[in-house]
């Protein structure tokens, strides 16, 4: 028997749980639409990275197997088979929600169902807003198929010259920055591509439009960087980002159009790829025909529309922790260590702390890691302001996938302001989230640290659940000082910390040691691990051994889980759960009954434990330890948003009509009650 679930199929199962949220009839309609948007965006990234990587392994005949022993070709086939039915489910769900929205006055209307007055408005919109922005190509002997960037959205048409009767093909690119949903009247929307399609004869004069289809391509978007050859890492990353849009096509999505037109488009793309990538045979791309609009990720335009608030869940306002109500945040932290649970407790104190430090004359230095900070960052702006007055050192991780460009921009801005900027660590990704502020008061140096499971991004802090920790304890600060020194000197793998634990050297051995300690207690042992993913085979094997010793193990794994629970003789004492709800579960909390409870930036994956700089933080303060344990206990009682994984890889929603509990709703109400 195979001891592990396949990584890729386990991720797809997570995305299925996201799709299930869109099916939840208890949710407001735009909330359901939001989950369809998330589902599609997730799948885009899965194809850009995971499927693209498997294709590379297959095409280069690299004998690499998944944790379950499946080779790349087998995994690609399993992915295609898994999605074949689910894509149809997604389409049906969209059509159901679309019909319900129509009854509420939000109408996504096909162009051919518009009346004459509405079509006149669409024509005006085309002339004023779209005509100058679309890029039409007539494909003939002098105009070959152009390169298509990742996530290109376009129309492909068969056209006939009215004079010569010659039939040819045309490509019309639609820019990504246009509004997809055009509101012709209050609540009446038509898709931009349908407006363009209806006016193609204005782009191809003296031609008759015979057939047309919308299509979208997804390309390999992984960035390969040879760090050994990098003299200017920022410049190398900048050049690599320019190449991202030139990746090989891995997925084709089409809508409408005849089978003949579809075959012509597919053949054209394959021919283009064969010549562009100099392959002996056309590359195999996954091709899907859609009965609904392409790219449901654009549904965010409707979800965020200001006119339909009654169709959305009410906004929750995060609460300010009472200990941060004082004007001087540093005094609050000096009094006691504090732990916040975002988004229920506000992220504002983190931003305020940096802003206060930047303007405080007693501040000597600020050291910080930045992983994903977003395009509009008050934190970076505060650091830029501080850099003109005090010592500011920032480690900006340029390898944060899909945030490379934003991070590069902020790194350059910080450098211009006078900050010392380090672009990551050689062959490691810095994923630890840490901040160290040093002040001088009463002729003494005082250190303040902030450590977190989540990013320094106020926007994501409103939708991701994370814990963040504030301390003025010297033993913690000393470890962080040591770690920053090692990062600045590129010797991260050689640092041994005293209070905290750091990957790639310390976290995995520590977790294994903690599992072994619970094994010594046999049936009295108890482990709860909450993470985004569990993939590391060594950790999984130790959990199997602990189960066989009688240790009770509860795993709360939001996404990928390669461990097989409830297998007789292997994992009978292991239960695996996943919570998918309004907020994205992102905190990593690790509880060991006979030792301690920890929080971490690291998931239980080889990349986190072996190829990244991560932190594992013990909760030595009893109040903080109890708060972390309370989070786990409530999530294990969830009967509305919790799924359980069985030994066959199936997820089933946990239900108890007599005791309904949504853990995320509970924490919202608890925050209101407490504060």
Where are these regions (language model features)?
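Hydrophobic alpha/beta core scaffold segments
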Residues: 552-556
């Amino acid at each position: 028997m195979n001891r592990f679930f396949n990584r890729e199929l386990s991720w797809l199962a997570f995305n299925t749980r996201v799709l299930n949220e869109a099916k939840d009839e208890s949710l407001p309609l735009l909330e359901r639409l939001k989950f369809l948007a998330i589902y599609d965006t997730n799948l885009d990234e899965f194809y850009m990275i995971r499927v693209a990587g498997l294709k590379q392994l297959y095409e280069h005949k690299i004998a690499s197997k998944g944790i379950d022993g499946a080779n790349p070709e087998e995994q690609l086939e399993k992915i295609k088979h898994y999605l074949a039915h689910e894509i149809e489910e997604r389409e049906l769900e969209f059509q159901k929600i679309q019909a319900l929205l129509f009854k509420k006055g939000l109408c996504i209307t096909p162009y051919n169902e518009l009346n004459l007055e509405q079509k006149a408005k669409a024509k005006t919109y085309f002339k004023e807003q779209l005509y100058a922005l679309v890029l039409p190509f007539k494909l003939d002997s002098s105009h070959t198929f152009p390169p298509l960037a990742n996530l290109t959205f376009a129309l492909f048409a068969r056209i006939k010259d009215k004079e010569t009767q010659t039939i040819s093909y045309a490509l019309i690119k639609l820019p990504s920055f246009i509004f997809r949903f055009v509101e012709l009247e209050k609540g009446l929307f038509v898709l931009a591509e349908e407006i363009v399609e209806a006016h193609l004869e204005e782009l191809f004069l003296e031609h008759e439009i015979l057939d047309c289809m919308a299509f979208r391509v997804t390309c390999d978007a992984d960035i390969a960087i040879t760090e050994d050859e990098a003299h200017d890492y920022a410049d190398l990353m900048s050049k690599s980002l320019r190449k991202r849009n030139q990746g090989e096509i891995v997925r084709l999505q089409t809508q409408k159009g005849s089978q003949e037109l579809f075959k012509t488009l597919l053949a054209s793309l394959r021919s283009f790829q064969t010549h562009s990538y100099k392959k002996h045979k056309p590359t195999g791309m996954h091709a899907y025909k859609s009965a609904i609009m392409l790219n449901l990720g654009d549904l965010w335009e409707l979800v965020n529309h200001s006119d339909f608030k009654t169709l959305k869940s009410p906004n929750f306002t995060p609460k300010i922790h009472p200990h941060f109500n004082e004007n001087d945040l540093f005094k609050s932290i000096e009094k006691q260590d504090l732990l916040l649970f975002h988004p229920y407790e506000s992220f504002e104190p983190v931003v305020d702390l940096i802003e206060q430090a930047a303007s405080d004359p007693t501040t000597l230095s600020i050291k910080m890691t930045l992983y994903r900070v977003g395009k509009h960052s008050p934190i970076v702006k505060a650091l830029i302001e501080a850099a003109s007055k005090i010592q500011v050192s920032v480690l900006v991780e340029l390898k944060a996938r899909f945030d490379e460009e934003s991070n590069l921009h902020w790194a350059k801005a910080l450098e211009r302001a006078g900050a010392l900027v380090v672009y990551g660590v050689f062959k490691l990704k810095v994923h630890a989230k840490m901040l160290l502020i040093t002040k001088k008061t009463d002729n003494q140096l005082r250190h303040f640290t902030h450590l977190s499971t989540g990013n320094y991004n106020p926007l994501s802090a409103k939708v991701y659940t994370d814990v963040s920790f504030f301390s003025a304890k010297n033993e913690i600060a000393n470890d962080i000082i040591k770690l920053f020194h090692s990062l600045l000197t590129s010797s991260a793998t050689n640092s041994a910390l005293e209070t905290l634990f750091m990957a790639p050297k310390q976290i995995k051995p520590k977790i294994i040691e903690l599992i072994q300690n619970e094994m010594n207690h046999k049936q009295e042992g108890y482990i709860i691990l909450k993470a985004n993913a569990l993939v590391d085979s060594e950790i999984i094997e130790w959990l199997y051994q602990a189960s066989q010793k009688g240790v009770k193990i509860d795993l709360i794994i939001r996404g990928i889980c390669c461990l097989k629970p409830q297998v007789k003789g292997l994992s009978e004492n292991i239960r695996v759960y996943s919570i998918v709800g309004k907020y994205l579960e992102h905190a990593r909390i690790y509880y060991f009954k006979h030792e301690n409870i920890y929080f971490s930036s690291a998931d239980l994956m080889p990349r986190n434990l072996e190829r990244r700089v991560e932190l594992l933080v013990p909760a030595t303060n009893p109040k903080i330890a109890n708060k972390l344990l309370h989070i786990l206990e409530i999530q294990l009682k969830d009967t509305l948003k919790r799924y359980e994984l069985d030994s066959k890889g199936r997820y089933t929603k946990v239900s108890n009509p007599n005791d309904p509990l949504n853990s995320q709703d509970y924490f919202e109400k608890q925050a209101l009650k407490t504060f």
